[in-house]
Protein backbone atom coordinates (compact mmCIF):
# COMPACT_ATOMS: atom_id res chain seq x y z
CA UNK A 1 0.00 0.00 0.00
CA UNK A 2 1.43 3.36 -1.04
CA UNK A 3 1.69 6.11 1.57
CA UNK A 4 2.26 9.66 0.35
CA UNK A 5 4.08 12.26 2.39
CA UNK A 6 6.93 14.72 1.92
CA UNK A 7 9.56 12.00 2.26
CA UNK A 8 8.01 9.61 -0.28
CA UNK A 9 7.47 12.43 -2.76
CA UNK A 10 11.03 13.74 -2.39
CA UNK A 11 12.65 10.30 -2.63
CA UNK A 12 10.32 8.76 -5.22
CA UNK A 13 9.41 5.75 -3.08
CA UNK A 14 6.02 4.18 -2.33
CA UNK A 15 6.33 3.88 1.44
CA UNK A 16 8.17 6.05 3.98
CA UNK A 17 10.39 3.19 5.09
CA UNK A 18 14.10 3.95 4.89
CA UNK A 19 16.48 1.12 5.72
CA UNK A 20 19.24 1.85 8.22
CA UNK A 21 22.77 1.88 6.75
CA UNK A 22 24.11 -0.74 9.15
CA UNK A 23 27.81 -1.49 8.77
CA UNK A 24 28.64 -4.81 7.08
CA UNK A 25 24.91 -5.56 6.63
CA UNK A 26 23.51 -2.78 4.46
CA UNK A 27 24.73 -4.08 1.15
CA UNK A 28 22.98 -4.73 -2.16
CA UNK A 29 21.09 -7.85 -1.05
CA UNK A 30 19.30 -6.11 1.84
CA UNK A 31 19.03 -2.70 0.18
CA UNK A 32 17.50 -4.11 -3.02
CA UNK A 33 14.91 -6.07 -1.01
CA UNK A 34 13.85 -2.86 0.76
CA UNK A 35 13.75 -0.87 -2.48
CA UNK A 36 11.82 -3.62 -4.29
CA UNK A 37 9.27 -3.59 -1.45
CA UNK A 38 8.66 0.13 -2.03
CA UNK A 39 10.98 1.64 0.59
CA UNK A 40 14.39 3.25 0.29
CA UNK A 41 17.27 0.79 0.46
CA UNK A 42 20.62 2.21 1.56
CA UNK A 43 24.12 0.89 0.88
CA UNK A 44 26.61 1.67 3.63
CA UNK A 45 30.13 2.82 2.79
CA UNK A 46 31.84 2.57 6.16
CA UNK A 47 32.99 -1.03 6.12
CA UNK A 48 34.46 -1.42 2.66
CA UNK A 49 36.95 0.07 0.27
CA UNK A 50 35.58 2.08 -2.64
CA UNK A 51 36.06 -0.75 -5.13
CA UNK A 52 33.89 -3.01 -2.93
CA UNK A 53 31.23 -0.31 -2.61
CA UNK A 54 31.33 0.27 -6.39
CA UNK A 55 30.62 -3.43 -6.95
CA UNK A 56 27.73 -3.28 -4.47
CA UNK A 57 26.23 -0.33 -6.35
CA UNK A 58 26.65 -2.15 -9.68
CA UNK A 59 25.03 -5.26 -8.19
CA UNK A 60 22.23 -3.14 -6.73
CA UNK A 61 21.36 -1.93 -10.22
CA UNK A 62 21.00 -5.54 -11.38
CA UNK A 63 18.71 -6.37 -8.44
CA UNK A 64 16.34 -3.39 -8.64
CA UNK A 65 15.21 -0.57 -10.86
CA UNK A 66 13.79 1.26 -7.83
CA UNK A 67 15.37 4.23 -6.02
CA UNK A 68 18.17 3.55 -3.54
CA UNK A 69 20.70 5.59 -1.64
CA UNK A 70 24.14 5.52 -0.09
CA UNK A 71 25.21 6.52 3.42
CA UNK A 72 28.43 8.37 4.17
CA UNK A 73 29.27 7.82 7.84
CA UNK A 74 31.88 10.53 8.13
CA UNK A 75 33.68 9.16 11.19
CA UNK A 76 34.43 5.98 9.24
CA UNK A 77 35.33 7.34 5.80
CA UNK A 78 38.27 5.38 4.43
CA UNK A 79 38.85 7.50 1.33
CA UNK A 80 38.66 11.31 1.30
CA UNK A 81 37.23 11.14 -2.25
CA UNK A 82 34.04 9.42 -1.03
CA UNK A 83 31.72 12.28 -2.09
CA UNK A 84 33.27 12.45 -5.57
CA UNK A 85 32.94 8.68 -5.78
CA UNK A 86 29.24 8.71 -4.82
CA UNK A 87 28.53 11.45 -7.37
CA UNK A 88 30.38 9.50 -10.10
CA UNK A 89 28.27 6.41 -9.36
CA UNK A 90 25.10 8.27 -10.31
CA UNK A 91 23.50 7.84 -6.90
CA UNK A 92 20.74 10.42 -6.32
CA UNK A 93 20.09 10.08 -2.56
CA UNK A 94 22.70 10.26 0.20
CA UNK A 95 22.41 10.13 3.95
CA UNK A 96 25.29 11.55 5.94
CA UNK A 97 25.98 10.74 9.56
CA UNK A 98 28.60 10.63 12.31
CA UNK A 99 30.03 14.04 11.52
CA UNK A 100 29.33 17.61 10.50
CA UNK A 101 26.60 18.21 7.92
CA UNK A 102 28.75 20.96 6.44
CA UNK A 103 31.43 18.52 5.27
CA UNK A 104 29.72 17.09 2.15
CA UNK A 105 26.29 18.73 1.83
CA UNK A 106 27.20 21.59 -0.53
CA UNK A 107 29.26 19.34 -2.81
CA UNK A 108 26.56 16.66 -3.02
CA UNK A 109 23.73 19.12 -3.51
CA UNK A 110 25.61 21.06 -6.21
CA UNK A 111 25.84 17.75 -8.10
CA UNK A 112 22.05 17.37 -7.85
CA UNK A 113 21.85 14.79 -5.06
CA UNK A 114 19.24 14.80 -2.31
CA UNK A 115 20.92 14.88 1.12
CA UNK A 116 19.48 13.91 4.51
CA UNK A 117 21.63 14.11 7.66
CA UNK A 118 21.22 11.96 10.79
CA UNK A 119 20.76 14.07 13.93
CA UNK A 120 20.57 13.05 17.61
CA UNK A 121 19.71 16.49 19.06
CA UNK A 122 17.79 19.66 18.26
CA UNK A 123 21.09 21.57 18.05
CA UNK A 124 22.39 19.12 15.45
CA UNK A 125 19.13 19.39 13.50
CA UNK A 126 19.36 23.18 13.36
CA UNK A 127 23.00 22.96 12.26
CA UNK A 128 22.09 20.49 9.50
CA UNK A 129 19.26 22.69 8.22
CA UNK A 130 21.62 25.69 8.25
CA UNK A 131 24.08 23.59 6.21
CA UNK A 132 21.40 23.16 3.53
CA UNK A 133 20.36 19.52 3.87
CA UNK A 134 17.13 18.53 2.13
CA UNK A 135 15.88 16.57 5.12
CA UNK A 136 16.71 15.07 8.48
CA UNK A 137 16.86 11.62 9.99
CA UNK A 138 15.98 12.18 13.64
CA UNK A 139 17.50 9.31 15.61
CA UNK A 140 16.95 8.96 19.33
CA UNK A 141 18.71 6.79 21.85
CA UNK A 142 16.99 3.61 20.63
CA UNK A 143 18.74 3.79 17.26
CA UNK A 144 21.80 1.73 16.46
CA UNK A 145 25.41 2.82 16.23
CA UNK A 146 27.51 4.75 18.69
CA UNK A 147 25.44 6.63 21.25
CA UNK A 148 25.90 9.43 23.73
CA UNK A 149 24.62 8.57 27.23
CA UNK A 150 22.75 11.90 27.22
CA UNK A 151 20.72 11.06 24.09
CA UNK A 152 16.95 11.21 24.45
CA UNK A 153 14.31 8.86 23.08
CA UNK A 154 13.16 9.29 19.50
CA UNK A 155 9.58 10.03 20.54
CA UNK A 156 10.84 12.90 22.74
CA UNK A 157 13.25 14.27 20.14
CA UNK A 158 11.00 13.93 17.08
CA UNK A 159 8.22 16.39 18.04
CA UNK A 160 10.80 18.88 19.34
CA UNK A 161 12.72 18.89 16.06
CA UNK A 162 9.50 18.86 14.03
CA UNK A 163 8.34 22.03 15.85
CA UNK A 164 11.54 23.92 14.94
CA UNK A 165 12.33 22.98 11.32
CA UNK A 166 10.43 22.77 8.06
CA UNK A 167 12.24 20.05 6.15
CA UNK A 168 11.11 16.46 5.61
CA UNK A 169 11.94 14.23 8.58
CA UNK A 170 12.55 10.51 8.82
CA UNK A 171 12.25 9.13 12.36
CA UNK A 172 14.76 6.46 13.40
CA UNK A 173 15.18 4.29 16.46
CA UNK A 174 12.66 2.35 18.51
CA UNK A 175 10.16 1.40 15.82
CA UNK A 176 9.25 -2.25 16.24
CA UNK A 177 5.75 -2.59 14.77
CA UNK A 178 2.98 -0.74 12.99
CA UNK A 179 1.79 0.97 16.17
CA UNK A 180 5.15 2.51 16.94
CA UNK A 181 5.54 3.53 13.31
CA UNK A 182 2.06 5.13 13.33
CA UNK A 183 3.04 7.11 16.43
CA UNK A 184 5.90 8.70 14.48
CA UNK A 185 3.45 9.95 11.85
CA UNK A 186 1.13 11.52 14.44
Positions of PLM-derived features:
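Glycine-rich beta-strand-to-loop/alpha-helix junction loops that act as flexible
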Residues: 170-175
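A compact, surface-exposed functional segment
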Residues: 182-186
Amino acid sequence: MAIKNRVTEMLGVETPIVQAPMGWIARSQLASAVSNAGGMGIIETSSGELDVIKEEIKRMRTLTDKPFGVNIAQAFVRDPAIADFVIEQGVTFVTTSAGSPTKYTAQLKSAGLTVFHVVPTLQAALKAVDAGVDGLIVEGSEGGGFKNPRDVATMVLLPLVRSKVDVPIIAAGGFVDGKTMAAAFA
